[in-house]
Amino acid sequence: MDAAGKDSAIEHVMTGVNPQGVQVVGFRSPSPEELDHDFLWRISKALPERGRIGIFNRSHYEEVVALRVHPEWLERQKLPSAPRGPALWEERYEDINAFERHLDRNGTKIVKFFLHVSKTVQKERFLARLDQPGKEWKFNAADVDERALWDEYMSAFESALTATSTPWAPWHVIPADHKWLTQALIVRILVDAIQALDLSWPEVTEQDRQANLEARKRLELEP
């Protein structure tokens, strides 16, 4: 959702994490190249390597939310003639669930957050952007047009979250009216998820250990 605090959550939650192990990708409107592929292609391209943390600011869920509110945008996607209507969204839910299941089976832990800001607070944040010179650049007049479709978006979000919250990739709906609370809840969930991975330091082989002992002796013999 616009003005839900996605950028600030990423900034504050990841403070202190070694940036060498993190990548952040923001998804906007698909490029002409991306429109020449299926809707999950650009997501696959942006996935992190094993051992790294990947953060998606927006994602493939735009394809079952924004496009459901604006079905006319589908015309740019060069889709087959069928299916359209409700069947299309059901098929995309299936595709997303299968895609995320595939990632989970291959070692990618998926944690999904929906930052749920109220309509009142969204309005306050839009006005605050307009009032502050350092934030006005973040305001987009088109966001007000989308705000007029609030009920349609809420319906699309509800359908998508219900259909795609799975044991391997559950949704976490986070209240987003108070940023400190939003960020604290995200941190708690991420800490629990990382601890559940039961990570450990890389094992040192016996051969490496012997080489390390020899290196230690050489260091200790140095004047």
Label each PLM-derived region with a short phrase.
Residues 1-223:
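Glycine-rich phosphate-binding loop of ATP-dependent small-molecule kinases
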